[in-house]
Amino acid sequence: MKKTPFITLEKAKEIKAQIPTPFHVYDEAGIRANARALKAAFSWNKGFREYFAVKATPNPFILQILKEEGCGCDCASYTELLMAQAVGNTGHDVMFSSNVTPEKDMRKAYEMGAYINLDDSTHVEFLSRICDGKVPETVCLRYNPGGSFSLGNTIMDMPRDAKYGMTEDQMAGAINRLQKLGTKHFGIHAFLASNTTANGYYPELASQLFRLAVRLRNATGCHFAFINLSGGVGVDYRPEQPASNIALIGEGVRQKYEQILTPQGMDDIAIFTELGRFMLAPYGHLISTVLHQKHIYREYVGLDACAADLMRPAMYGAYHHITVLGKEDAILDHVYDVTGGLCENNDKFAIERSLPQIEIGDIVAIHDTGAHGYSMGYNYNGKLRSAEVLLKEDSSFQLIRRAEKPSDYFATFDFTDFHFGG
């Protein structure tokens, strides 16, 4: 299926006249429509809520849009908690997942009244100590089933190799201890596959977690308030990939819910999700201008963006589709490596990619950068992070994060006598 950018050459030029490339641009209309589609897919569950994974796109303007669409925030660090709080998310608007968590972070989550998702059974005492002997009324526990996680004959991931979560026996012990300390309600959380467009993933994960909830309820007598399916629902980065069908996924989870939980009298359990990539990736582009061309053993196109603006291709070998704006319908009769300017040979957005003829000054849109794009940026080689722009529903645009300046790069030397220009 052809991938079409949500921004035109004319609009990109209009933005570029005020905000130089490279910049990340986000599609407000697409974000809102997708959030509503997710909500509709799980409307059968009265307590359903999406907790957007802040790490995917940590920008308060994006979080505010999602808040308006009924989403909470999934946080995993002190600063992510501060950002969630800045847009008015407190209490059970926030899910905090522990993971080698510093005391400062855990205490902040507790003080905010967030749902706390414990990664390990030893964290029960850690939490109790931080809470001065108290514990929250509701606590979530992260599950790791071990072994491999499969759909049919296809192995999706290897939980046994993951650092996250606890065993079923450890969960039972943690529940018993927490009940003695005063916890009254529990949640279950698990993340067993990443970026899968297989529509059967969530239903299979749900089936495993629903059955686990029944076993743990029977073993401990506890009450489960929610089950958090976390993330993992992917997007179609490549044109030939199938897209996730969220309506079909939601229906699959509903069927498992009614087969497993309802007969057990556990049909008051809310379903939560923590989708980052699915919620935002398709609704972000990295917009960049062609600076140079090089003709040696391959044809190279050099952009003003680099891996510091989008790490995924360099780090994971990930595919991101590229559109030369204004040439959407041109013949793909040239083959290029599309590169950035870092002093690293893996700073390539595409390798031997078929594209239309490219000229210096062309503007390109690198697709699906709305999640894990800007957020994974860095300052290697002294590169400065790019701006973020919101393309609003009325086709106007708004700067939602300015580009870094040299003064930002040097800011942490403010205690010294060095003086930096720029």
Predicted regions: what is each one?
Residues G72, M95, N117, C140-R142, ...:
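Structured core elements
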Residues I31, K55, S77, A109, ...:
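Conserved, mostly hydrophobic/aromatic
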Residues L63, A86, M106-Y110, L127-I130, ...:
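Short acidic, glycine/serine/threonine-rich loops at helix termini
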Residues M266-G422:
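Charged (often Lys/Glu-rich) extended helix/loop segments that serve as interaction or gating elements
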Residues P58-F61, L82-M83, P102, S148-F149, ...:
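Flexible loop/turn segments at secondary-structure boundaries
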Residues P145-L291, L355:
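Active-site loop/helix belt of alpha/beta enzymes
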Residues M1-E137, N176, K180, K184, ...:
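A charged N-terminal "starter" segment
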